């Protein structure tokens, strides 16, 4: 039975404004709902076996379902079904006092928003009642379509499936005294990264077990049965045990079904009320056991097996998302909301428990809401090499600084799936040691090392960027050709950083072993196209690809990167010895301005070469010699920080929470790139040259990477891509002719 909003409004708490349906009464409320199960001054229920704790956990689960469905239906948009199938598990964790809850499933967003509303976190966004919750759901500057860095109390920027585990593991590493549960959908369990990344992490950090995957095993993915829907309970338990989990805690709703529902997956909201309480008690006990196990040093997983869409408008994959007809007037929506309706008194009780749990609103108590204190780095010990002196390996020069950072900051880690030795940065391993349970001096291995080297780009990128998001310094290193497998999680995190409510150390990466250094390895190792992705991301506002031309400039690039916040800084450099072209002072100016002239000569007409990269400078300098012999003026400009070369209106910098609005002005641009002809040169993606090509008014052209091939030398590979002095001279003469 329900009462209309108008009839009930006088007796309703203010926060209930906007709730469409209320129950007239609830079974057993007078017996188990007299006072909040989480007492005043406490942060959790005292005993998960107490009947009032179980009863109020059930109320909380239904409150989450109701809000999830009502806010999604208010926009006929969003995903209620997945979260609904694990509402009891989420409610149980909150009642047990755990507020640092993360998700691997972006589609669980409306459920998480509902939880943040109930514990009053969303008041920091001006959302104080359900009507405002409805109004601002899936709206700009409101409750974004998927979880992000913008919402108080939640730091789970769930991008593509297979990412949320990184945030939980990162937070667990930094905060050993707290539990970090994270929900995982069984549809997403098909992603290879979820379990493998946890296995890698557990090998490296066997004592860090205070993260808790909560598998939402509901039998369905987005549009069909999940690929693990045919597994038995025993098979699922064996799966997790086979992947190193010591404790597997599973609750199957089917074991409590008294309505003879068909199939292996059932809806607990269809049970009799007594059986609903039994099921909720089992989930609460399981959550308590799993939490204690994870905090006690065992790698643990909690599994709740319940039909997708339990308690909402549809069941199975049909409950995954709403369609245009699923408005608040839709019969299925109305029936589900009326069935899940609570009394005003029950709403007040749920809200009180959620607010008290964990010591207050997640927006005030979650570890992600505060700035992590960082160690002082002191002097980095930069070493300036003489311009024109002996060629040096840029990555090795940077590696020395990285070692110093790690020695000063024990939370700092370096990750690299390809191996630091192969990237010219063996000195990082020597200084910081590879994390491995087997000590071995030959390989610089030590269980307490700071270099994380599983052979998985996702695991490496995920831990590095996850720790940065949580407030710690890191460095992700990779071969340029293989970094693509870690790029999705990096993009997710840097996008979250752009809207994060606090400053945090920038994501810093080092990509090396570029295409020109991989001739013998062939095209499988020659994939500079990743630069096109970062070129596009430069317009986001907080992405800064940098291309130091030598061993001096790479040191100043890293020095600068360490001072920044909420950015994604991608350092791309060769691992081969190359000429020293810039002083430290010049290098720092290049970072500030975006580029710097390496060579300039006069002539009747001037050709400007705008060069992105280090090794590709060689044919450009050779071309300059030929052009100068023909009395053509030549200027060679090294493009070090192309993001600075855009116009302010090209980039969404002013929408970033830590805005960086420094751009080279028109006079500075003309001073660097003004001439009779302009040729952009890169051994990577031509998109990196876009800022220059947009602003130049000269006759211009671009030389860029085309495709890979097996070759005996960098020069041969450049020739295959048209990057030769002969071609550059020919085109220059055509442009000025």
PLM features: residue spans?
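Short, highly selective alpha-helical patches that border small-molecule cofactor pockets
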Residues: 86, 112, 166-168, 233, ...
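Conserved internal helical-beta-strand scaffold that buttresses enzyme catalytic cores
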Residues: 2-78, 122-158, 351-372, 380-387
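Glycine- and acidic
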Residues: 49-53, 69-77, 98-99, 150-156, ...
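Cofactor-binding active-site loop characterized by glycine-rich and histidine/acidic residues
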Residues: 49, 57, 64-69, 74, ...
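Non-catalytic terminal/interface segments that mediate subunit docking, oligomerization
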Residues: 57-60, 101, 352-505, 587-596, ...
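Thiamine diphosphate
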Residues: 133-212, 281-285, 420-533, ...
């Amino acid at each position: 039975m329900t009462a209309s909003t108008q009839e009930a409004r006088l007796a309703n708490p203010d926060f209930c404004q906007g709730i469409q349906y209320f129950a007239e009464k609830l079974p057993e409320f007078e017996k188990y709902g007299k006072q909040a199960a989480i007492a005043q001054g406490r942060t959790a229920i005292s005993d998960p076996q107490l009947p009032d704790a179980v009863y109020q956990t059930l109320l909380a689960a239904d409150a989450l379902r109701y809000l999830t469905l009502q806010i999604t239906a208010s926009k006929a948009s969003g995903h209620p079904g997945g979260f609904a199938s694990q509402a009891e598990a989420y409610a149980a964790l909150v009642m047990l006092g755990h507020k640092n809850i993360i998700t691997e499933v972006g589609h669980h967003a409306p459920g998480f928003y509902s939880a943040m509303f109930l514990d009053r976190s969303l008041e920091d966004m001006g959302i104080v009642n359900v009507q405002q919750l409805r109004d601002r759901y899936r709206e700009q500057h409101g409750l974004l379509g998927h979880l992000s860095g913008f919402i108080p109390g939640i730091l789970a920027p769930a991008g593509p499936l297979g990412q949320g585990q990184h945030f939980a593991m990162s937070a667990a590493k930094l905060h050993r005294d707290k539990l970090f549960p994270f929900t995982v959908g069984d549809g997403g369990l098909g992603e290879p990264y979820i379990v493998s990344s946890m296995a890698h992490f557990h090998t490296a950090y066997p004592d860090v077990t205070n993260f808790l995957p909560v598998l939402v095993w509901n039998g369905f993915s987005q549009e069909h049965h999940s690929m693990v829907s045919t597994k038995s309970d025993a098979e699922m338990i064996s799966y997790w045990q086979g992947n190193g989990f010591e404790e597997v805690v599973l609750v199957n709703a089917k074991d409590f079904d008294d309505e003879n529902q068909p199939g292996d997956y059932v809806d607990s909201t269809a049970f009799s009320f007594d059986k609903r309480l039994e099921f909720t008690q089992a989930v609460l006990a399981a959550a308590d056991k799993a939490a204690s196990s994870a905090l006690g040093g065992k790698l643990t997983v909690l599994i709740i097996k319940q039909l997708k869409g339990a308690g909402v408008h549809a069941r199975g994959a049909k409950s995954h998302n709403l369609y245009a007809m699923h408005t608040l007037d839709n019969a299925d929506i109305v029936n589900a909301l009326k069935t899940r309706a609570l009394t005003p008194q029950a709403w007040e009780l749920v809200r009180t428990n959620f607010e008290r749990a964990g010591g207050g609103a997640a927006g005030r108590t979650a570890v992600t809401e505060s700035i992590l204190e960082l160690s002082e780095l002191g002097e980095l010990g930069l070493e300036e090499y003489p311009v024109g002196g002996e060629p040096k390996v840029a990555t090795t020069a940077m590696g020395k600084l990285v070692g110093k950072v790690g020695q000063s900051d024990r939370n700092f880690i370096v990750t690299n799936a390809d191996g630091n030795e192969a990237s010219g940065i063996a000195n990082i391993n020597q200084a910081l040691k590879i994390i491995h349970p087997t000590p071995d001096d030959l390989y610089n291995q030590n269980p307490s090392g700071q270099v994380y080297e599983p052979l998985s780009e996702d695991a490496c990128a995920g831990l590095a960027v996850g720790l940065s998001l949580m407030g710690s310094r890191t460095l992700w290193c990779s071969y340029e050709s293989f970094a693509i497998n870690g790029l999705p999680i990096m993009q997710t995190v840097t996008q979250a950083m752009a809207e994060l409510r606090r400053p945090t150390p920038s994501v810093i990466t080092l990509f090396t072993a570029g295409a020109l250094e991989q001739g013998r390895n062939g095209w499988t190792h020659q994939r500079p196209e990743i630069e096109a992705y970062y070129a596009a991301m430069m317009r986001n506002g907080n992405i800064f690809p940098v291309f130091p031309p030598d061993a001096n400039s790479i040191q100043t690039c890293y020095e600068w990167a360490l001072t920044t916040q909420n950015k994604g800084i991608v350092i791309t450099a060769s691992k081969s010895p190359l000429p020293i072209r810039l002083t430290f002072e010049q290098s720092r100016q290049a970072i500030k301005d975006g580029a710097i002239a390496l060579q300039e000569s006069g002539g009747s007409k001037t050709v400007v070469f705008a060069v992105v990269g280090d090794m590709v400078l060689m044919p450009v300098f050779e071309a300059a010699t030929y052009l100068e012999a023909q009395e053509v003026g030549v200027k060679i400009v090294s493009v070090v920080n192309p993001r600075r070369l855009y116009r302010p209106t090209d980039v969404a910098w002013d929408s970033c929470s830590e805005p960086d609005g420094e751009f080279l002005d028109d006079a500075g641009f003309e001073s660097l790139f003004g001439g009779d002809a302009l040729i952009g040169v890169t051994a990577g993606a031509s998109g990196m040259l876009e800022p220059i090509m947009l602003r130049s008014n000269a006759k211009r052209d671009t030389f860029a990477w085309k495709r890979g091939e097996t070759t005996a030398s960098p020069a041969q590979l450049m020739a295959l891509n048209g990057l030769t002095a002969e071609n550059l001279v020919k085109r220059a003469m055509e442009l000025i002719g």
